[in-house]
Amino acid sequence: MALLLLGVWGILLLLGLWGLLQGCTRSPSLAPRWPPGPRPLPFLGNLHLLGVTQQDRALMELSERYGPMFTIHLGSQKTVVLSGYEVVREALVGTGHELADRPPIPIFQHIQRGGGIFFSSGARWRAGRQFTVRTLQSLGVQQPSMVGKVLQELACLKGQLDSYGGQPLPLALLGWAPCNITFTLLFGQRFDYQDPVFVSLLSLIDQVMVLLGSPGIQLFNTFPRLGAFLRLHRPVLSKIEEVRTILRTLLETRRPPLPTGGPAQSYVEALLQQGQEDDPEDMFGEANVLACTLDMVMAGTETTAATLQWAVFLMVKHPHVQGRVQEELDRVLGPGQLPQPEHQRALPYTSAVLHEVQRYITLLPHVPRCTAADIQLGGYLLPKGTPVIPLLTSVLLDKTQWETPSQFNPNHFLDAKGRFMKRGAFLPFSAGRRVCVGKSLARTELFLLFAGLLQRYRLLPPPGLSPADLDLRPAPAFTMRPPAQTLCVVPRS
């Protein structure tokens, strides 16, 4: 191991010298003026200023010195960081297609090869996104039929929770319901919680998300050649291939034998129907159908499941907030009436708590964009192909927008009379052309599941721990998921 580390450092030294020589001979940047930023080191750039975890906080600290728009070097790659509500919103909403692309992130280039929805760009991304938005609308994500499926899943989750008899259970179990709702939408059926396919998919998704957030993948994305030499990407690619194997089987069993004109009953069925139509640019060929399904499985499960887990965990951490939510639910719904989407107006405190959860946890701190053309932004001219990081954490914790940004405070979303109020700086789903395609469904299912759980259960820390003992530091993963924890779920009398 010592010899291997010496060899790696030798490679880094040689590459650093090469980078220094290249910097002396490289032609000037196309942009007449970059935002200010810290001076980079040869080869490493500014990586020494960023931690391995919670890099968004390190970037926010740099913004205090260099301003809301600054340049950092991730290795040799110049990258522009946007920090704070005003500049992030201007970039995401005010620029149109010029900032709608993704930069070529090495690990996702290996996984998706430019396909799918979330890390693709250009015509393929536009076609995939338009199709997905249209299909979700046609499947009725806001209609009573989908509400019924969410409430059915809530009933199944309650049955699973009841089986523990008030004994400690893993927080991760609460993510099963949101995952199954996504699978119902994608595949047209829910899975039993003991179904081997369901169990395998959840386990693989969990492993992939942990690997994607690992230091090894961060190193691979910054120095892909070195990372490939060290085979840092192999573990995650191996797990992704296991997911693909399951998805291929699910796709094959849902492939219509002949072109049909009837409405699709699931996202996958709609994808397969689209692939049977005239598709001269192969937008919906077999490879991209699999890539789109993989994207929806990974992103559509992790984010909503982690948010529900955080919401429950924060109620255990803040029992006084939990009590106020339950008082409101008892007053408006009583013990027997299940929550419905239209109840949100009558439940302002419950709605405020859910919004505050999403603000406070900053689940996806930043997903980079890339300039599709030379662009004027914040007084600077950024050339085509510049990676740009809109730092969503800085928006959700912006001191100019939130009264107590570092505290969990549902009053951020309540006016002086206790009525729910929207906040412009509430951007957990991002904004503009890349806003989350599943935003509407996520909001509906989070409200129904959260309200349904608190209506029925008291959420308590495990024996031997008090709420003050609970550690809120996120677990290392691609998203800022909650730590592995147990809790007790006890029926309310």
Curated annotation (Swiss-Prot):
One of its GO terms (cellular component) is plasma membrane. Coiled coil: none annotated. It catalyses: all-trans-retinoate + reduced [NADPH--hemoprotein reductase] + O2 = all-trans-4-hydroxyretinoate + oxidized [NADPH--hemoprotein reductase] + H2O + H(+); 1-(9Z-octadecenoyl)-sn-glycero-3-phosphocholine + reduced [NADPH--hemoprotein reductase] + O2 = 1-[8-hydroxy-(9Z)-octadecenoyl]-sn-glycero-3-phosphocholine + oxidized [NADPH--hemoprotein reductase] + H2O + H(+); 1-(9Z-octadecenoyl)-sn-glycero-3-phosphocholine + reduced [NADPH--hemoprotein reductase] + O2 = 1-[11-hydroxy-(9Z)-octadecenoyl]-sn-glycero-3-phosphocholine + oxidized [NADPH--hemoprotein reductase] + H2O + H(+); 1-(9Z-octadecenoyl)-sn-glycero-3-phosphocholine + reduced [NADPH--hemoprotein reductase] + O2 = 1-[(9S,10R)-epoxy-octadecanoyl]-sn-glycero-3-phosphocholine + oxidized [NADPH--hemoprotein reductase] + H2O + H(+). It is found in: Endoplasmic reticulum lumen; Cell membrane; Microsome membrane. Disulfide bonds: none annotated. GO terms for biological process: aflatoxin metabolic process; phospholipid metabolic process; retinoic acid catabolic process; xenobiotic metabolic process. PANTHER family: CYTOCHROME P450 2W1 (PTHR24300:SF291), CYTOCHROME P450 508A4-RELATED (PTHR24300). This is Cytochrome P450 2W1. It comes from Mus musculus.
